[in-house]
Amino acid sequence: MAISRGDKVRIKRPESYWYNDVGTVASIDTSGIRYPVVVRFEKVNYNGISGSEGGINTNNFAQAELEPA
């Protein structure tokens, strides 16, 4: 599966807050890390962090945890 920046992908990691949601690939790291694909979502998650309104709207995933949407 060849995923590239800007592609719409569906999340297939069952424990993820965004499971079965669709997001946009923001970047792909090629250095060999475990979760190289950064995906950006429209909605934020439930973790509010200091300095942001509401929560986080990006997360890292392995390519095997994604499918084209």
Curated annotation (Swiss-Prot):
Keyword Nuclease: no
Keywords: Membrane, Photosynthesis, Photosystem I, Thylakoid
Subcellular location per the Swiss-Prot or TrEMBL entry: Cellular thylakoid membrane
GO annotations of cellular component type: photosystem I reaction center; plasma membrane-derived thylakoid membrane
Topology in the lipid bilayer: Peripheral membrane protein
Chain segments annotated as coiled-coil in the UniProt record: none
GO process annotations (BP): photosynthesis
Main location (coarse class): membrane
Superkingdom assignment: Bacteria
HAMAP family referenced in this protein's UniProt entry, alphabetically: PSI_PsaE (MF_00613)
Family note: Belongs to the PsaE family.
Name recorded for this polypeptide: Photosystem I reaction center subunit IV
Source organism: Synechococcus sp. (strain CC9311)
